[in-house]
């Protein structure tokens, strides 16, 4: 039973005291500030944009909101670099799909931040279950990201996996687009807030730079 809304559902995650908070309550109040910030953003670098969004007070250290943040940041960065699209329609569709991805998918489904990047690529290419030409692209992107995530290792960190997903997605997208997209190097400032931080094993840990 969710400790906030009191709805009952199956879960694999409770706190040390046995309390459970559902994904809807966990991310309540997150999506509107994120969407508002993205719509008004002019930042062209997707990693810098990701850091801005993750700095919003409504975004938690970990949580399912990152499944929507990754594809939304990718979409917004492309728009800001001149990629042609119907931005509002695409952003709405991305958020609708990403909110269906539950928390804990990194451990329970094995897809993590790659799921959001796959949603981004699916929307950008117009892919669907029966689309012959576009169908492979989201699959290939997700496989590239998952390989990188697995190489870095666990346990989960929504900040680390979001950054990796963004980096790999942009490198992948550059192969098929003439739009030039900048990609900075970033250092993590969240490691002290993450009890499971892998420290020197993380490519964004400050000591590694």
Identify what each model region corresponds to:
Residues 1-7, 46-57, 88-107:
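Short, hydrophobic/aliphatic alpha-helical segments
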């Amino acid at each position: 039973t969710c400790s906030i809304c009191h709805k009952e559902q199956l879960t694999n995650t409770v706190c040390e005291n046995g309390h459970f908070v559902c994904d809807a309550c966990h991310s309540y109040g997150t999506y509107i500030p994120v969407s508002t910030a993205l719509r008004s953003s002019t930042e062209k670098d997707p990693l810098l944009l990701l850091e801005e969004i993750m700095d919003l007070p409504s975004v938690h250290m970990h949580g399912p909101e990152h499944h929507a943040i990754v594809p939304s940041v990718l979409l917004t960065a492309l728009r800001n670099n001149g990629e042609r699209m119907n931005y509002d329609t695409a952003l709405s569709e991305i958020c609708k799909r990403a909110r269906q991805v539950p928390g804990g998918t990194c451990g329970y489904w094995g897809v993590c931040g790659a799921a959001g990047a796959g949603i981004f690529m699916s929307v950008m290419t117009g892919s669907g279950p029966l689309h012959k030409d576009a169908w492979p692209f989201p699959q290939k992107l997700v496989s590239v990201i998952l390989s990188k995530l697995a190489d870095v290792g666990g346990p989960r960190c929504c900040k680390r996996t979001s950054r990796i997903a963004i980096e790999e997605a942009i490198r992948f997208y550059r192969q098929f687009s003439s739009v030039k997209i900048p990609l900075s190097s970033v250092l993590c400032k969240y490691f002290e807030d993450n009890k499971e931080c892998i420290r020197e094993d993380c490519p964004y840990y400050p000591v590694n730079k």
